[in-house]
Regions:
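Transmembrane helix-loop junction
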Residues: 39, 216, 264, 303, ...
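Short coil/turn motifs that cap or connect alpha-helices
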Residues: 232-233
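Transmembrane helix boundary and interhelical loop/hinge segments in multi-pass membrane proteins
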Residues: 210-229
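Secretory targeting signals
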Residues: 52-101, 145, 154-208, 213, ...
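Terminal transmembrane helical anchor/hairpin motif
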Residues: 18-19, 60-112, 116, 177-186, ...
Length: 384
């Protein structure tokens, strides 16, 4: 907050005056907000985009809605998926026994060493046993490096990673689901996956739709006329930001309602616990600040270039940047100023990337700063 007040003071904008001006020009702001929101509602891009988002997100999330306890004599689903994408609805669960996982990994290494095909090494049983004795007291990483340097056995570490999950029996799957649901409700996990995909879709959608926020106002004749009207910079800028923000919130609320109802349906059918607040909390923390930031970026770009369109490629590149999480010691970290929060991991193992909460606070502060700068730009270009 100290940084915010420093920037505001630097720009010679008194926050008290900002609040006072907003209260004073409340009717003017309401007019701007209503007009902008009506323009959005009349825009077919909003409705077409909403339909596309719902369909795309359903395709991404529908598999999680198939999760259920395996009934007696029920055949476990045999979905054709890559092992790295396999999850509990495909019949795969994490391998919890490290000793068993290590034993299976060593068996895989030994089989490959003794394989006489072009993919194997053609070792005899005695030679393979000798190699296994050499690595038996090493950890997996060290053993993999040893196999690569001494025998040219590359990527042994990936064979161990593939054993992170295994095809579970009905009893194992049910026990795993029951254990996870004793920690959190089904909606707690589903809401995180929903937020993951909703954040991605909303970032792209907001980048496209918000380009219309200033598109009419930045036409030369309209732009010059606006600067001669008795509307203050604070009233205009805040009115436009709020209208764009409310429009995006409306779309987000619709998505929350649709997918909460789907989550509730699955929970009732499968006997899973559900908590309605999970969707609201995740959306509020991990999506709302991103939408606010996108609105503010469009605002300042539109004022600098007198055209909002240059913001679109900038934001698309920013989305790509935000999607590229960094990893350190097997832990995912958010990139600074990301406008999208990801939740890596399988359904019941999902977790928010580290530094996400701090990043969201930074986005809110940055949004306030961008609004203050935008107000200053508007004032300096005003025709008296």
């Amino acid at each position: 907050m100290v940084l915010v007040f420093f920037i505001v003071n630097l720009l010679r904008i008194d926050l008290y005056d900002v609040v006072k001006e907003i209260k004073k020009g409340r009717d003017t702001m309401k007019t701007i907000i209503k007009r902008s929101i009506l323009d959005y509602l009349k825009n077919p891009v909003l409705w077409i985009g909403l339909i596309i988002i719902v369909a795309s997100m359903y395709q991404c999330l529908s598999s999680y809605l198939q999760i259920h306890y395996i009934k007696q004599n029920e055949q476990i689903t045999q979905n054709d998926v890559a092992l790295e994408d396999a999850d509990v609805m495909d019949g795969y669960i994490p391998t919890s026994d490290d000793k068993e996982r290590r034993r299976e990994w060593e068996d895989t290494i030994k089989e490959t060493l003794m394989d006489t095909s072009k993919n194997g090494f053609g070792f005899s049983r005695q030679e393979a046993d000798h190699v296994m004795k050499e690595i038996q007291n090493m950890d997996v990483k060290t053993a993999s490096e040893f196999l690569e340097s001494q025998y040219g056995y590359y990527n042994a570490i990936y064979a161990y990673e593939d054993l992170e999950i295994h095809k579970g029996t009905a009893e194992e799957i049910n026990h795993y689901i029951e254990r996870k649901l004793s920690e959190h409700s089904f909606s707690w996990y589903f809401a995180k996956k929903f937020t993951d995909f909703a954040g991605l879709h909303m970032a792209f959608f907001a980048t496209v739709l918000l380009s219309f926020l200033f598109i009419q106002d930045t036409r030369k004749s309209t732009y010059e006329l606006l600067h001669t009207k008795p509307v203050t910079a604070i009233q205009y800028i805040c009115g436009k930001v709020i209208s764009g923000f409310i429009s995006m919130l409306g779309v987000l609320v619709i998505l929350n309602v649709i997918f909460f109802m789907l989550c509730l349906k699955t929970s009732l059918e499968s006997g899973f616990p559900v908590t309605p607040i999970d969707f609201c909390v995740n959306s509020l923390i991990y999506i709302v600040p991103n939408l606010l930031m996108i609105c503010c970026v469009y605002t300042i770009i539109a004022l600098i270039f007198k055209n909002p369109l240059p913001a679109a490629p900038i934001l698309f590149l920013h989305i790509i940047y935000s999607n590229m999480l960094t990893m350190k010691n097997d832990i995912y970290y958010m990139r600074p100023f990301s406008i999208m929060v990801r939740f890596p991991g399988r359904f019941f193992e999902t977790h928010v990337a580290k530094m996400s909460n701090i990043n969201q606070i930074i986005l809110v502060i940055s949004s306030v700063i961008l609004v203050c700068i935008s107000v200053t730009i508007w004032k300096r270009r005003r025709v008296h």
